[in-house]
């Protein structure tokens, strides 16, 4: 719905960028983990996720009036991703050790992705409005983090299970913020479209 809003209004007003950028890097990192582990669920989901998040980042950059900060953040996280790729492929020859290090790297990025929408927490409390938060993204985050936690539990993979638990917690916190500080009549909650 945020992408649809940007295309309709040709504006990025009241839409956060950082959650989508960190999600894109997160998808690309987990795609590498899935390839190394040969887990087709991780590969498929994160390939689709990375493609969609990259589309969002490009549309956001196109409609953003302040392109320089958006581009700098994107390039910074891309540099981190490239440095991580070089580290994991060139400096760690053992596949088991590489899988453990990459799992830890992905876990840290997943936690940062789930915490990034809370960057505006002080602004939300001060303004008593959740206009800058996306309700559909909150619902999706809750469902995704719950699903991945259960998937990690089923596989006995702590790298998948543990970092997704903060997603559940931060989603519940954002649901509370939406209840406590409604976004107002200019941006009501829209239902998720299938």
Which role does the model predict for each range below?
Residues 1-194:
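Alpha-helical membrane-protein topology signature
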